[in-house]
Amino acid sequence: MTAAFAIGYDWLYDVWTTDQKSQIMSSMITYGLDLGVAAYGADPTFTGWWKNATEGNWNCVCNSGLTMGALAILGDDTSGTASQLLGLTIDNAKQNCAMAVSSDGSWSETANYWYFGTTGHAEMSASLISATGSDYGLLNANPVFNLTGMFHMYITGPTSLFNYGDHGPNKYSTTANSMLYYAEQYNIPRYALFQRDQRDAPEPWSMFWYNPTISGAFWDDQPLDHFFDDALDQWGSMRSSWTDINALYVAMKAGKLQGHQTHNDLDSGDFVLDALGTRWAGELGSGDYRSTGYFSSDAQDSLRWLYYRKRTEGQNAIIVAGQNQLVTAAPTIQHGTTGESQGSSTVYNVPGNSAAYFTANLASAYGNV
């Protein structure tokens, strides 16, 4: 809400009356920025849990909204709240939000929360650049953040995303237009070429972040298969075409079962399968977030694992003796591909000898049976 007020205050600044500006600014400070300062410790009775070791969407969204609000009123705020807050949010976002991207580019929560997190990250850095001329190191605080667009490309199948964890079928919490922004900031035009034709592209940020001078096809010389090796995530994406809605697509994961901001499932070995325009093996997605203990913890005895959609039996994964996988699982993986890439044409027939594989040793997930 603070972000929305910030945009309205800034973009319509020349038409607001003095009283209107004062009222809007007062509301932003009282119901947004003051609470942000309290969350950072000014009020010891206020708990801002999202600021501490929260490498994910909450940190990105909260810091982004507070930063946008502070920047919008910085020149008018005589209370000092805006400048005080900027001294807190930027460094915190660099230490937390930016670190949600793993060493291989994966978003460490889930494919769905990539949307929330990267939108917050992009809005925050874009606002800093627009208002001050600098992002203060946010874009490069994590040296591999630029790889996260690749994560989004490969986790997108012909019918839907590889929607593991807390993520319902086609549940888009916002758009992927951060891809347009990252294409410019990281000089990776392929990200914008991928996003510009997606169904979620027509929304306001595309007007500001899309560079209409880019040309080409995102799939031109883009490998069909890609593997993400960070031990936290460990997953692979394999397909027969980038442009055929009837293409074969298989995505499979191993990875650790803790450290995903309590948005993961007990799902080492989980997979999805698309073919002939249909998802034949899919995901159940999120449960009811209001359910008792749903976000209690990712410990072995967590109430979260009592819910069918979160426990092992609710996944496309192996069940042994009816037991959940161990949260301490540390799978090892092997993978390979013959390395085909699609050319510039939308018509592509994968060679008959094309092959890709992803295997995982899941023994550590079943040490309890």
Name each model feature, range by range.
Residues 336-369:
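Long, amphipathic alpha-helical stalk/connector segments used for oligomerization, subunit docking
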Residues 250-347:
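Catalytic core of carbohydrate-active enzymes
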Residues 1-156:
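Aromatic-lined, polymer-binding surfaces characteristic
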Residues 109, 164-166, 320:
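Generic structural "secondary-structure junction" signal
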Residues 49, 73, 113-279, 346-351, ...:
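Carbohydrate-active enzyme catalytic cores, enriched for enzymes
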